[in-house]
Structure formats: structure tokens, C-alpha cells
Regions:
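Terminal targeting signals and extreme-terminal segments of soluble enzymes
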Residues: 1-295
């Protein structure tokens, strides 16, 4: 099933198998199954996939609140405070503010069962394992009749159905490593990765930035990228990435005593005059040092 005609039949969101529910006029939740194909070095769902999840839940809320106007993601911040093992992982979003030109959504990420029920550990539901916020730019419509009316019946449910991932998500994009220590990676701008504007989807951008940061930060510590867990993403979306390939570069910042380090990742659209499309602050830590109590 699609939401407002998006995504197409063959698309990453469908292969991630996301199930969504608009729970009120200003809240929604979206979940996906935690599989080895989307796992990070800590065994939990990787930060780029969590960013994709919260981008979708934020977009679902914004689309309902703003219709007939539309929106584009301006920035997204994600903080992961512990491994996200599943069996399903769910982003629960709520509207924080609607202004004339921007809209802000907050999301908490929790582990749930297949029906979306909280997992119970020692008689209580666990605390959220990640937090995110998103700012959307409001795009006024030129045709007030074009957006239709949202369904008055709540909750509204739908699912993005696809064939599933039979290989790691970075290979499915696919990500090509050009120069790991420099954080130079690339992905094509193909329909499988597009958003509703025909540009690379915001969650895919997060996945590329996560991978680029892990490559550069791992190399700076004499480690492989697969040893690093990305815990924080702060993403500024500056321009649409439409032509491709989309190429990243990374500048490594200081490293803490526990191996925690940061990098600034920039993404450029090589086919559009190397236009700067995205800037991302990435924080990562070696998997063996990922202690949720100190994140």
C-alpha cells in the first residue's frame, strides 16, 4: 500500500516493510522489523534506519496537519541511547509546533512486538532507546483542491510492502566506498531511493552520512567501519539531491577517552555541479565501548 501515492512498488521503504498508523490529528507511529540486514555493530538497528523511521513518522504527521499544503524536511536530529534489538522497533511521533513557515515534530523510539505492543521486561515497559526531532519547511500549495481531505476516521493505518531486504541495507542502496579514511562514499540517485519530490529520500541521506562517518571515524582509530556504532546524527538538509551520484566527504573531530568521536560529513550532488545538499554531524563509538549509561 502507498500513502498519497508514495512510495512506488519497488522502493527501499517497501523493502523495509514499514507499518504506519495515524493515531490522532497530531500523533502517529511507524514500525519496522529489526533484521540482521539493518543491524549495526551493537546488534541493534542502525542509526540511519532509525532516522528513516522517524522521518517517515514525522512526514505522516506533517502531511495530515498541513494539507492541502506540503512540506520538506529541513533538519533532523537523532540521539540513540542504547541498542535497539527489536523484534520490532517503533517511532512514536507527536506535533510540537506548527508555525506559518515551519512545523516541528518529536519522536521517541521504542522496542515493540509485531502488533505494536510495548515489550515488558521485569514487569515494566522499557524506556525509549532513541529520541529525535524534525523541522519541516511548509510549502504552500498553489491549488487548494489538489491535496484532498484527510480521512476523518482515526486511527488510519497503512503499510509499505515490498520484497524485503536479502542483503545488508548499505549494499541494497548501494553504497560504494571510494576512500574510507576520507569518508568518501557514493550512492546513485535512483527511483528506488527517491522521495515524493524525485530526490534522494531523507532517511537514505542519513544512511549515507552514517556510513561515511563510520568509515572516517573507524579509520582514525585504526578500526574497521563495521566496528563503530553511530549514536548521534544532526542533519541539515540544504538542497534536493536529484541527479547523482551523491558523494560524501568527512572531517574528523576530536576523539574522547572512551573512543567516542565526531565528524562533520558533507554530501554533494556530483551530477549537479557538486552542489552541497546536506551537512551532518556524526558521533560514533567503538561497539565494545557503547555503554548506554554514558551516552
Amino acid at each position: 500500500m502507498t500513502f498519497l501515492g508514495y512510495p512506488p512498488a519497488e522502493h527501499l521503504l517497501g523493502d523495509l516493510g514499514m507499518a504506519a498508523e495515524i493515531t490522532s490529528e497530531t500523533t502517529a507511529r511507524v514500525r519496522t522489523r529489526a533484521t540482521p540486514q539493518i543491524a549495526s555493530a551493537d546488534g541493534g538497528v542502525r542509526a540511519g534506519v532509525l532516522a528513516t523511521l522517524v522521518d517517515v513518522v514525522g512526514g505522516a504527521i506533517a502531511a495530515r496537519v498541513l494539507r492541502p499544503d506540503w512540506m520538506a524536511t529541513a533538519d533532523l536530529a537523532l540521539e540513540v541511547v542504547g541498542p535497539v534489538p527489536g523484534p520490532w522497533v517503533e517511532a512514536r511521533g507527536s506535533l510540537l509546533r506548527r508555525g506559518r513557515t515551519t512545523l516541528v515534530v518529536e519522536a521517541l523510539v521504542v522496542g515493540v512486538d509485531e502488533d505494536g505492543n510495548d515489550l515488558v521486561v521485569d514487569g515494566r515497559a522499557p524506556d525509549p532507546v532513541a529520541w529525535a526531532s524534525m523541522t519541516f519547511a511548509v510549502l504552500p500549495t498553489q491549488d487548494a483542491s489538489s491535496g484532498g481531505r484527510p480521512s476523518p476516521e482515526l486511527p488510519t493505518r497503512w503499510a509499505f510492502s515490498g520484497g524485503g531486504l536479502d542483503l545488508p541495507v548499505l549494499e541494497a542502496l548501494p553504497v560504494t566506498v571510494l576512500d574510507g579514511p576520507a569518508g568518501r562514499l557514493s550512492i546513485p540517485a535512483r527511483p528506488y531511493l527517491h522521495n515524493s519530490f524525485g530526490a534522494v529520500q531523507g532517511g537514505v541521506v542519513a544512511l549515507l552520512a552514517e556510513a561515511a562517518g563510520a568509515e572516517a571515524l573507524g579509520a582514525a582509530q585504526g578500526r574497521d567501519a563495521s566496528d563503530m556504532v553511530v549514536t548521534d546524527l544532526q542533519i541539515a538538509y540544504l538542497a534536493l539531491a536529484k541527479v547523482g551520484p551523491i558523494v560524501s566527504s568527512a572531517r574528523v573531530l576530536a576523539t574522547g577517552t572512551d573512543g567516542r568521536a565526531g565528524a562533520v560529513v558533507e554530501l554533494h550532488d556530483a551530477g549537479a555541479g557538486h552542489r552541497l545538499t546536506t551537512v551532518v554531524n556524526v558521533t560514533a563509538v567503538p561497539a565494545e565501548h557503547f555503554d548506554p549509561t554514558v551516552v
